[in-house]
Every structure is written in C-alpha cells, then in structure tokens.
Regions:
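C-terminal charged capping/lid subdomain of soluble metabolic enzymes
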Residues: 5-34, 347-434
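ATP/NTP phosphate-donor binding region
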Residues: 14-133, 387
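Generic secondary-structure signature for well-ordered alpha-helical cores
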Residues: 69, 98-103, 124-128, 151-154, ...
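Active-site nucleophile and cofactor-binding loops and adjacent substrate-binding regions
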Residues: 110-114, 137-139, 299, 320-325
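Glycine/threonine-rich beta-strand-loop-alpha-helix active-site module
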Residues: 117-223
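Carboxylate- and glycine-rich phosphate/diphosphate-binding segment that chelates Mg2+/Mn2+
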Residues: 195-297
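Active-site segments that bind and position negatively charged phosphate/pyrophosphate groups
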Residues: 255-373
C-alpha cells in the first residue's frame, strides 16, 4: 500500500510540474544535461515562425483559380504525379482554373520520393514553360518538386548543387525572386505546404538531402481535408507515422535558445530552429490526435535513399520505395530510447499521451517506456518488423551511418549529440522491433 501511495504522489508531482510553464525559457530540463556552446560560438536567442499563408476548409480547393486570377497569373504550371492526375483533387483544380480563365500546362511526371534526376526533369519543364505561377497538387514529393522547379526556373544560370544543402551542395542563399506557388496537399504529415524545404534522394551518394530556404516556401497552402478521402489505407498510415515522429522530434528537440551558432543576420536563421513555446503546443496537440485517431520522418533519410527492392503496399510506383513516414517510424523506438536521458520528463509526457501508464514510472525509465509504447503502437498497426523486414541487414549499417552524417541540419537539433558509433548502434537496434 505504501509503495502505491508513493507512486501516486510521484505521479501527481510530475503532473504539477507539467502544469507549470514548460517553455524553454523557463524550463530547466536541459540545463544540467548540456554543456556550453562550442568555443567561439554563441547560442541563439530567438525563433521565427516563417511559414506560408494557410487556408483550411472542406472544398477550399475550388478557390485556387480565383487565387491565381487575383495574383495576375497568365501562364500556370500544374504539377502532380501520374496517379493523382487521374483522381478528383487534380480534376477539381483544373476545373477551377478553366472556370477562371487561367491558361495552364500539366506536368504529371513527379516521382514519389523524388531524386536529383527527377527534380532536374521538372526543372527543365519549368524553364521551357516560362510560367508566371505554379500549383502543386499532391503529397510532399509533388510540393518539393514544384518548389525546386520554381527556384531553378527563376535562377536559370545556377548549377543544381548551388542551392543544395552543404556539405553535399554549396548551400548558397537564394537571392532571386520566385514566382507564386500554391500548394494543394493531398496527404497529411509532410507539412511541405508550410516550409521552405525541398527533399530529394541524391543518387550519387545514395542519401536524402535537400534545399532549405524561406524563399522557396509556397505563397499559399490550400488545406482541403476532402482530399484525404482518396488516400489508400497504407498511405494514410504512413502519413500518420510522419505526424507521430515529427511531433515527437519537435517536442523533444534541443530548445531554440541552446542551438548554435546564433545567426549574424536574421535572414540566415535556419528552417529547423529547435523546440519553442509555439511549436510545443502544436506538437502535443498532434500527438493527442495521433493517439486518438491513428489506429482507427534524420535517420530516415539514408533508409529511404538506400532502399533496395522494397515496395510499400498501396504505392503505385515502378521503383523501390520506402515512404518517408515508414522510414522514420522504424527507427523511432531506438532513437527515443537514446535521446531520453537529456529530457526524460518530456519523453515520459509523450509516452503518457500515447497511452502509457506512467504513474509508477521512474525518470531513468523514460526512454524504454516511450520505446515500448511506440512498439505496441506499430505492432497494432501491422508495421514491418524493423529494417530487416524491408530488406536491410547489419552489412548495410556502415552505409546507413555514412548517409546520416551529412544530415546535420536535422541531427544537430537532437537533444543528445551522436557519434558514428552511436548511430551504428541505433541502426542495429532498429533491425528488429518486436
């Protein structure tokens, strides 16, 4: 009885602690765990919510033609993929463009999980078309491809690697004006309609990388929940895994005021800035939505980039494909076990949101508790049993680690720094989940 009482008291104390202000400025979760910023560098003191304008509503897609008319668009590029080009979301967009007298051309050769090669094909189409506006209808792959096409068509003399993130590319800042881009997402999870990020597989190195600049973010995102009704079951699940993992990553990330270096000019503040009071609210809300409804995305990048023969169910593609949401979630139990020691209270809180009973939990057990909660979640949703189930083996681990190392823009926001040995151990632990 005494043990149960003590456990109840500990649970109530944790709840009271969570009721207090948890923003990074007032929380000391990380203050004892992390040392000072690297020598010669200073940490940031601000964060910025640099996102696209968003319009939400069932049926809002039909307004796209009026939006383009209001922008003065005369020659529009409509980008999508082969599958979606035959489905209602694209037809609704085309009907709206025709109704409002907008001239347009369709590019429907977007590759699901794009590559540098597929980006360049879309870029050539955009350069030849001399478009004055773009509409992207699809998931993250379509929106990212359209961002890249808009960028390089607006900067036709640039080499492809000029704007690609360092160290793979040159990471040059975007200084040219881009054309308006309206994003019409048909999946939930990527959030590409709000960001200045375009992700692709760089085939030469077999890794995912991208372009990150606020200049390429869409002008407007039209969020129409009716489009999700056309998603196959497994696409719905993998999109949900994207939401789950990115919400966990956001909430447990290094706080914005501990990220270094501090930018010398606000224009160079990165897209990924760390946890902050605003994103914390949305991350927790997203986790609650996932916990309630789902059962009814750094380490994922090399997994997707090095895919061999695996083809995800419900994805009608002619190439091997590991969807981003799946590649993220397969490593999540190992990753959050690893990061928990730096912010155990937040890891326990997320485990509780996802259904774990944390009343008798000890702080040192935060990682294993969250990992077990995630495993049960994935098992109930019939997710593949780890990396081995989608074609990887221990022999692939060195290449997976090599593919993770260039992803500093993402991995440096993890609350716990990682060595190559740490990454290797995480991939090995992710070979089998159950």
């Amino acid at each position: 009885m005494a043990a149960a009482t003590r456990a109840r008291v500990a649970h109530l104390l944790r709840q009271l602690q969570r009721a207090a202000c948890q923003c990074p400025t007032h929380s000391h979760t990380y203050s004892q765990a992390l040392g000072p910023a690297p020598s010669g560098k200073t940490t940031d003191y601000a964060f910025e919510m640099a996102i696209s304008n968003i319009r939400y509503g069932a049926g809002v897609t039909k307004e796209v033609g009026m939006d383009l008319q209001n922008m003065g668009a005369k020659n529009v590029c409509l980008m999508t993929d082969k599958n979606l080009s035959q489905l209602p979301p694209v037809q609704i967009v085309m009907d709206s463009l025709v109704k409002n007298g907008i001239n347009f051309k369709v590019y429907d050769n977007v590759r699901v999980e794009p590559t540098d090669g597929s980006f360049m094909e879309a870029i050539e189409f955009a350069k030849k078309g001399a478009f004055d506006a773009y509409v992207a209808v699809g998931g993250g792959s379509t929106m990212d491809t359209c961002k890249a096409a808009n960028l390089y068509a607006s900067s036709p003399q640039s080499d492809f690697l000029d704007y690609v993130n360092a160290p793979i590319g040159k990471g040059k800042p975007v200084s040219v004006p881009l054309k308006p881009l309206i994003a019409v997402p048909t999946t939930s999870g990527t959030g590409s309609e709000t960001t200045g990020v375009a992700i692709f597989d760089y085939e030469h190195l077999k890794v995912k990388t991208g372009i990150a600049s606020r200049a390429i973010k869409p002008t407007l995102g039209l969020i129409d929940p009716l489009h999700t009704l056309h998603m196959p079951d497994r696409v719905v699940a993998n999109s949900g895994f994207d939401v789950l993992c990115h919400a966990l990553e956001s909430y447990t990330a290094l706080p914005y005021h501990m990220r270094s270096p501090c930018p010398s000019n606000p224009i160079t503040r990165p897209a990924y800035q760390g946890s902050n009071p605003v994103s914390d609210i949305w991350a927790v809300h997203a986790l609650r939505i996932v916990a309630k409804y789902l059962k009814s995305h750094g380490m994922s990048y090399p997994i997707s980039g090095l895919v061999k023969t695996y083809k995800a169910k419900d994805y009608n593609v002619d190439h091997p494909l590991v969807p981003h949401g799946l590649s993220v979630v397969l490593t999540s139990p190992a990753v959050f076990t690893f990061t928990a020691q730096m912010s155990p209270e937040r890891h326990l809180e997320t485990a509780e949101i996802l259904g774990a009973d944390t009343r008798t939990a000890r702080i040192p057990d935060a990682g294993p508790i969250l990992a077990d909660t995630l495993r049960k979640f994935l098992f109930d949703l019939d997710v593949d049993d780890g990396l081995a189930a989608i074609g990887y083996s221990k022999a692939d681990i060195p290449a997976l680690v090599k593919g993770t190392l260039p992803q500093e823009r993402v991995t440096k926001l993890a609350p716990r720094p990682q060595s190559e040995e740490d990454l290797s151990a995480l991939f090995e632990a992710s070979m089998k989940l159950y």
